[in-house]
Amino acid sequence: MKKVGVLSLQGDFAAHGAALERAGAQPVFVREREQLNQIEGLILPGGESTTMLKLLRYEDLFDDVAEFGRTKPVFGTCAGAILMAKGVTNPAQESFGLVDIEVERNAYGRQTDSRIAQVRPFPDFENRTAPGELKAVFIRAPIIRRIEDGVRVLASYQGDPVLIEQGRFLVATFHPELTDDARVHSLFLSKL
């Protein structure tokens, strides 16, 4: 069984653990650098990106997670997507810069503007997983404002990319872990 880490300093890491189990993987809740040696891939969960950055620095994990991402698969959702982006606006902030995208934080609005939407994935996603719409939970979600060459869009919402991949990296601006649909997590497992 594949072991996948979920950064567990803040955010919805428990929901990702359950989603990984549904997808057939063993979650490892990463709170210490030594745990990075036990996993094949890492999920950066949703939560609050500035808080995660502070905790990564406080726990002295930032550089270790960055190093992990230089050689291993990483999947970021919502705040995790922000942490993976090369560019962050509204406001600008530090990130791991793993994926050639620029994101705007909280671009769908405030907490009260959060929503659940049905998203039609592109054929490339469906061909590699299964057909059907994705239930996308957007909670103060970022919008991907720019993508560079080599980034593949797998699903969009209102014309904006919401699920992308670049090589071993997967990014969702929504929360697939908050639904019973394990296809996005299964796609990540295929990168391990």
From Swiss-Prot:
Reactions this protein catalyses: aldehydo-D-ribose 5-phosphate + D-glyceraldehyde 3-phosphate + L-glutamine = pyridoxal 5'-phosphate + L-glutamate + phosphate + 3 H2O + H(+); L-glutamine + H2O = L-glutamate + NH4(+)
GO cellular component: cytosol; glutaminase complex
Keywords on record: Glutamine amidotransferase, Hydrolase, Lyase, Pyridoxal phosphate
EC numbers: 4.3.3.6, 3.5.1.2
InterPro entries (UniProt xref): Class_I_gatase-like, PdxT/SNO, PdxT/SNO_CS
Subunit structure: In the presence of PdxS, forms a dodecamer of heterodimers. Only shows activity in the heterodimer.
UniProt-recorded name of the protein: Pyridoxal 5'-phosphate synthase subunit PdxT
